[in-house]
Amino acid sequence: MPGVYGATTCAVLAPHDLITGGTAYEFHGHTDVKELAMYIQDTITVRNWSFNLGIRGDLYNGLAIARQAEPRVGIAYNFKPTNTVFQVSYARTVETPFNENLVIASTGCSSPFLALLVPPLGVPCNLGPIVPGHCNEFHVGLQQAFGKYLVIDGEYIWKYTHNGYDFGVVGSTPITFPIEWTASKIPGYAVRLTVPNFHGLTAFVVMSGVAARFFLPQVAGLPIIPVGNEVFRIDHDEIFNQTTHLQYQPFKRGPWLSFNWRYDSGLVAGASPCSAPTATCFSSTPFADGGGANIPSGQVALVNTVSGLPLTADQEFQAGLTCNGKLAAPNPLGPALATCSAAGLASIYVQIPKPGTKNDDHNPQRIQPRNLFDIAVGHDNIFHGDRYKWSARLAVINLTDKEALYNFLSTFSGTHYVTPRAVTATVGFHF
């Protein structure tokens, strides 16, 4: 890439460019990881109180060494007059490094090839090896029964990790490796409402949300992001999702009808191109606007903002990217659009913040919200047999044939669409 990479960089990378007749790069590394865990735990019940007490000790020997005692305690109280259970718990845990390609992550900066290939342009490869961290995790919960027709379960979670782990990718390959951030804070909640059986009607509603916040700078592993002190979200983060399920069976031995509604506010889609002087938009934002892309001011480079590589036409098509109201890649076979005006960049499937509104922590790129509906009808014992039973079921998944993404260029799973409308008929014989 003339004007972007210098002669030294090209001299290191060119021998392994298979398009020009180069050879595959081979990495050889080895280490032994040994871990010993010892723990003791007991449950004590006193009237309406229940105590779960324990302590664990971990001895970790890998590329780094850690020794840590990990206390944990859980307390529950059953207030019988109102059928209420309160619970609270705390656990301290040692966070050991992921083993997948741990050697590459910890020693890769000593390889000139990896030190130039993986880090963003201009980011030095000088971080140390992955070391164990520790986590403080708190849970607060409530269970409330309203007679025999409604039960509510709720829980709130705080998880604070020092030296929080994530994964990076070697270029556009499927090779992943662990990385380490300064810290992470992951609060979240989960609520479930259940109607066991009310005159043939059963129902439940499950809802949850999680904030997966990670704190720069990266402190270990091959660098994958510019140096900074910001807070950003990874693609586990979703503000709200819920599933509502209703099933009605008017007669105990008769047919039933079910309905399912799923809503998702959208996962973070950090690989989507964007324009802002932030860590996650660095590779798609022009030099003049505080980024690292060699393009005119006011433009956006259509690149994977995690790897820095240009998006292919297929990837632009999958993301539903539009430029000034027109598809960036109408055909997944090409050609791909290289840049777009920052004001004109949008997407059918991804929420891309407009210029001046992007914030890695509070307004990141996200998958568009979606509603999905399923219905089913069936009979579990058509001929009312005792020993032998026949059943039948007809189900329609994604009733409205909604077209949407689950994620975009996720580190492990890539890009996935929701299942298109599908009709399934099943006949069963039970004996």
Language model region names:
Residues 1-85, 96-97, 120:
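Signature of Gram-negative outer-membrane beta-barrel scaffolds
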Residues 45-48, 79-83, 149, 198-200, ...:
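Short loop/turn motifs that connect adjacent beta-strands in outer-membrane beta-barrel proteins
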Residues 45-50, 156-161, 177-274, 340:
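Gram-negative outer-membrane beta-barrel transporters
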Residues 51-53, 71, 84-88, 152-154, ...:
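Transmembrane beta-strands of outer-membrane beta-barrel proteins
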Residues 78, 86, 115-180, 185, ...:
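Membrane-embedded beta-barrel scaffold of Gram-negative outer-membrane proteins
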Residues 262-353, 367-372, 379-431:
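C-terminal beta-signal and adjacent terminal beta-strands/loops
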